[in-house]
Regions:
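Anion (oxyanion) recognition and catalysis
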Residues: 58, 114, 140-143
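Auxiliary Fe-S-binding modules of radical SAM enzymes
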Residues: 127-192
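Short, intrinsically disordered, low-complexity segments enriched in Ser/Thr and Pro
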Residues: 112-120, 181, 188-190
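Core AdoMet radical
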Residues: 2-7, 12-109, 119-128, 148-152
Length: 192
């Protein structure tokens, strides 16, 4: 679970499920040879038994979808090696808190991951304890490393127009590729 979501959901999820994932079953307990497995665990990377689970998922040979994403802060070299031997749908990560210096962790994953472009989508929470400078730093850093940043706006109705423009610029991949610098982006407004 991402830091921003952890903050927002702590009072609900953590009280029910705890802050760490716990292995409750082996893969063979639910997998009957299906070609695809959707893993709904909110943070498999925070599970003490992750090594065993990663091995089991890898050995199925099935197409894996970590629907809740992976926590870049918890991934180590062994995890990346396991991931490199899995058949995967798109990977998802989050960099919600700009105070977390995650550039090194994203760089390490990018260097060790088998794909060298389109590594995965990274959700970036904005309008929640972040400045535009911090937002742009995260977006530009992720793009330079081969990730696909995706802007999420906390409390969008009260967000400044600049943050809304940032979301449109970043999340519209045609615009994002044609206009690589947000300072050069000229948003169009609907006329009333």
């Amino acid at each position: 679970m991402s830091e921003g979501m952890r903050f927002l959901l702590d009072c609900h999820v953590a009280s029910k499920e705890g802050k760490c994932s716990v292995k409750v079953a082996d893969v063979k307990d639910f997998w009957n040879g299906q070609k695809e497995i959707r893993i709904l665990d909110p943070n498999i990377t925070a599970c003490r038994e992750k090594r065993d689970l990663m091995k089991q998922y890898r050995e199925t040979g099935a197409l894996l979808d970590f629907t809740q994403g992976l926590d870049i802060r918890c991934l180590n070299d062994e995890d990346i090696e396991d991931i490199n031997h899995m058949r995967l749908r798109a990977l998802h990560f989050a960099w919600d808190n700009p105070q977390d210096d995650l550039e090194g962790k994203f760089r390490r994953f990018a260097e060790r991951f088998r794909r060298k472009s389109n590594i995965g989508m990274v959700y970036c929470l904005t309008n929640f304890n972040s400045t535009m400078k911090q937002n742009l730093y995260r977006i530009n850093t992720l793009r330079s490393l081969g990730y696909d940043p995706y802007v999420m706006i906390y409390n969008k109705p009260s967000a400044p127009q600049e943050v809304i423009d940032l979301q449109r610029w970043c999340n519209n991949k045609i615009i994002f590729k044609k206009c690589p610098n947000f300072a050069d982006y000229v948003p169009t407004r609907k006329q009333k």
